[in-house]
Regions:
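An alpha-helical repeat/solenoid feature that recognizes helix-turn-helix modules
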Residues: 25-42, 50-91, 104-208, 216-260, ...
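N-terminal secretory signal peptides that target proteins for export/translocation
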Residues: 1-3
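TPR/TPR-like (Sel1-like) alpha-helical repeat modules
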Residues: 304-305
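Sec/Tat signal peptide C-region and signal peptidase I cleavage site
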Residues: 18-24
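Bacterial N-terminal signal peptides
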Residues: 6-17
Length: 349
């Protein structure tokens, strides 16, 4: 009897370990994903400049070092590291200070060098500050909060610029833009939601207005497009899903139609803006949960781990993100792979 009971208990333990370790036959185990993240963070730490920044390979595509630095800081946070503590704490703190130093005094815009799309950079930097605000040393906390308040005000002012009905509620490349797209809107909405979550003054009406724009970009057959009625894609569908999920539209019909679309047409490595897409699709489908997350998790981890370089990096060597370089791609990959840790507040279900 005792031998039988011992066998049953051992079988249950092994079954539980197998279930935790292997999400699907052929998909990377949790340990393999963990090791991949560790290698990626070591790579990122080796690439930080003396100034505290992480540079883009080429700043001509509308992003700059401020956005890449913010993504790198969030990548460390997503893996459980805290500014000012542990092996990467000092590097993270230097990165945060560098971003703060690159906020324009006249209007609060984050920008390191001129580019065609400064609102991309601004949204990413604002999101990062909202995520670290409660984790930084008290000596830095007040500065982060004041910077965040100015950054949020600029986002709200940019949303309020008069736009036609098709574009109302969203954002585009510049604070003064009178049109919108889902890509820029996604970063601003994530930033506002994260800031509101920590008690910043973000009117509910601004969130609702932005959600109304996101819904305009949805397709009745499932998925989201760059502009309303522009043609759906996996990358934009991930953006739409995440935006709606974090704004209270959990598993809403529009969200689920897009999630079903992503199961039918999952993200591919040769898709335009793959690393942008892998972040949004992964985090968005994690929020949806259930079979949608299970299938996405297995697909994305297999895809990313097979493309990781021996030094721990990912490098968009060709295509739409080729000029962004490995710091950007590696940060986005870690943000996708680390979603199940739920260390970043925006990741929490």
């Amino acid at each position: 009897m005792n031998q039988c009971l011992s066998y049953i208990l051992l079988t249950m333990v092994l079954a539980g370990a197998t279930s935790k370790e292997c999400h699907a036959q052929g998909a990377p185990s949790d340990r393999e994903v963990d090791r991949s993240i560790v290698r990626a963070l070591k790579y990122l730490a080796s690439q930080q400049q003396r100034s505290g920044a992480w540079q883009l390979q080429n700043a001509s595509r509308g992003q700059d070092a401020a956005s890449t630095t913010s993504l790198a800081v969030m990548a460390f946070m997503a893996a459980g590291h805290v500014p000012g503590e542990g092996p990467y704490g000092e590097a993270m703190e230097r990165g945060i200070r560098w971003v703060l130093d690159n906020q324009r005094p006249e209007d609060g815009l984050f920008i390191h060098r001129a580019g065609s799309g400064p609102m991309y950079t601004h949204g990413i930097c604002t999101l990062m500050l909202a995520e670290v605000a409660g984790m930084v040393d008290p000596s830095l906390s007040d500065r982060v909060r004041k910077s965040l308040e100015r950054a949020i005000l600029l986002i709200l002012q940019a949303q309020a610029v008069p736009k036609g009905d098709r574009h109302a509620g969203g954002w585009r490349y510049h604070p003064s833009s009178n049109d919108s797209d889902l890509s820029v809107t996604g970063w601003q909405l994530l930033a506002l939601r994260a800031a509101k979550n920590i008690g910043c003054d973000v009117p509910a009406e601004a969130i609702e207005y932005a959600v109304s724009y996101v819904n305009k970009c949805s397709d009745r057959n499932g998925g989201f497009s760059y502009h309303p009625n522009h043609g759906v894609s996996p990358t934009r569908s991930g953006t739409g899903i995440l935006c709606l999920e974090i704004c209270g539209e959990h598993r809403a019909p529009t969200t689920m139609a897009a999630a079903d679309y992503l199961l039918r047409r999952p993200l591919r490595y040769d898709d335009g803006f793959f690393f942008y897409g892998v972040y949004y699709c992964t985090v968005g489908m994690f929020q949806v949960g259930g079979r949608h997350w299970d299938q996405t998790r297995n697909h994305v981890t297999s895809l990313l781990l097979s493309r990781q370089h021996p030094d721990g990096s990912w490098n968009p060597s060709d295509g739409s993100e080729a000029s962004f370089g490995p710091n950007y791609a590696t940060s986005m990959s870690v943000l996708a792979l680390a979603v199940e840790y739920q260390y970043l507040p925006i990741y929490q279900r």
